[in-house]
Design a protein with these regions (language model features):
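Non-ligating segments of multi-cofactor redox enzymes
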Residues: 1-259
Length: 259
């Protein structure tokens, strides 16, 4: 899938971007540095490299109530942090636009009267084999060696959207104001901040969730909370047929009352 997509982009899509056509054009200015500053080769994972550590989210669909606390806390932290400011051109209405790293989709399942409401939070899954990385023409998109987090170097990003086309989960968004691609960073500027109390060194969405539906940790550590939850609750990967090996996992819903 990735090889086919790379061939297609090389053959056609590069000609569609005004910035790509004019290689002397200056990339769009950014108002903040990338979450990790300049990302040299020393911090980038090589394609297919096996990492010893992989930070990720595990989301319990059984207790998510769709309150959007994760969405608003993510927006607040990242707008004021190193990834922001995040644009809000038209945040409300039938066709909202604006930059969100995390969204909650809600729908009704089943047939009346045996119906139920499903709340499904979705953000970047920090895949082990992220298709967004090899298609980036400037090397702005990369996966970190140290913890497996997938990030965007804003100083290199030209907003061409190739990574958004490659992502099967719709996890990347163009910030229309800054003209750079944005996505969940797992609050990388927060989880390593020694100025914060240890209990606060977790993604803003995890800290804000009132039902404890969001867990955070190293899925490569068999003794971690997230690994135990995946093992004991049957945590599953989203759309495994794409072979991206997403790090984030979901815990399935359970029947908690008689239907």
């Amino acid at each position: 899938m990735i090889g086919w997509l790379k061939d297609l982009l090389k053959a056609n899509a590069l000609d569609e971007s005004p910035v790509a056509r004019d290689r002397t054009a200056t990339p769009p200015a950014t108002t903040r540095p990338a979450p990790t500053g300049q990302a040299g080769d020393s911090v980038r994972a090589a394609p297919g490299e096996t990492l010893a550590k992989q930070l990720a989210l595990v989301i319990d669909l059984n207790v998510c109530v769709g309150c959007h606390a994760c969405v608003t806390s993510c927006k607040q932290w990242n707008t004021s942090g190193s990834a922001g400011p995040l644009a809000d051109e038209r945040p409300y209405g039938a066709d909202p636009t604006g930059t969100f790293f995390n969204r909650v989709q809600t729908w009704e399942a089943g047939t009346y009267p045996a119906t139920e409401t499903i709340h499904f939070p979705k953000s970047c899954l920090h895949c082990e084999d992220p298709p967004c990385v090899p298609v980036c023409p400037t090397g702005a998109s990369y996966k970190r060696k140290a913890d497996g987090i997938v990030l965007v170097d804003y100083d290199k990003c030209i907003g061409c959207k190739y990574c958004a086309w490659a992502c099967p989960y719709g996890a990347r968004e163009l910030d229309e104001t800054r003209q750079v691609m944005t996505k969940c960073t797992l609050c990388v500027d927060r989880i390593y901040d020694d100025a914060l109390p240890p209990e606060d060194r977790k993604p803003a969405c995890v800290k804000a969730c009132p039902t404890g539906a969001r867990l955070f940790g190293d899925v490569k550590d068999p003794d971690s909370e997230v690994s135990a939850a995946i093992r004991e609750r049957g945590g599953y990967a989203l759309m495994p047929e794409w072979e991206t090996n997403p790090a984030n996992r979901y815990l399935p819903r359970r029947v908690t009352r008689s239907q």
